[in-house]
Design a protein with these regions (language model features):
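Electrostatic cytochrome c docking/interface patches
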Residues: 13-30, 45, 79-80
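Stable alpha-helical elements in mature extracytoplasmic
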Residues: 21-25, 33, 82, 86, ...
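The canonical Cys-X-X-Cys-His
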Residues: 25, 31-41, 47, 118-122
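Gly/Gly-Pro-rich "capping" loops immediately C-terminal to redox-active cysteine motifs
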Residues: 26, 41-89, 104-110
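Hydrophobic aliphatic residues
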Residues: 29, 61-62, 90, 94, ...
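C-terminal capping alpha-helices of c-type cytochrome domains
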Residues: 84, 96, 103-127
Length: 127
């Protein structure tokens, strides 16, 4: 039996599922109002995000280091924008606040599945 066919089929199914998750994440990013403060396209301004100095999701950002305050006005720590940090930022937005940003994000009423879909979408934006 040729083992390559099942492996290719599994890879294809995984890609389709990943694309579906990104699409769902984009829909949630908009419907949960993330797009009001987090800019994702240079050509689409985000006045609320500019006023709050919210992190932008454009360019090469995923996996990069950033400085955050531990809590509101707390000590500075360097973190990496990875899955753990991103999910924590949605669940507990005041736990780590990007240096220079204003603490304004309210915790989002989301399920774990929704948070992971939003993360998949945001991660897909990084170049």
């Amino acid at each position: 039996m040729n083992i390559a066919l099942p492996i290719l089929l599994l890879a294809f199914v995984s890609l389709v599922q990943a694309d579906d998750n990104i699409k769902k994440g984009k829909e949630l990013f908009i419907s949960k109002s993330c797009s009001l403060c987090h800019q994702t396209e240079e050509s689409v301004p985000c006045p609320a995000g500019d006023a709050l100095k919210s992190p932008k999701f454009m360019g090469d950002f995923w996996g990069k280091k950033r400085e955050v305050h531990i809590g509101i006005g707390g000590p500075i720590k360097e973190v990496v924008l990875d899955e753990e940090y991103f999910l924590e930022s949605i669940e507990k937005p005041f736990a780590k606040i990007v240096k220079g940003s204003l603490p304004g994000m309210a915790p989002l009423p989301t399920t774990e599945e929704e948070r992971k879909a939003i993360m998949a979408y945001v991660k897909s934006l990084s170049e």
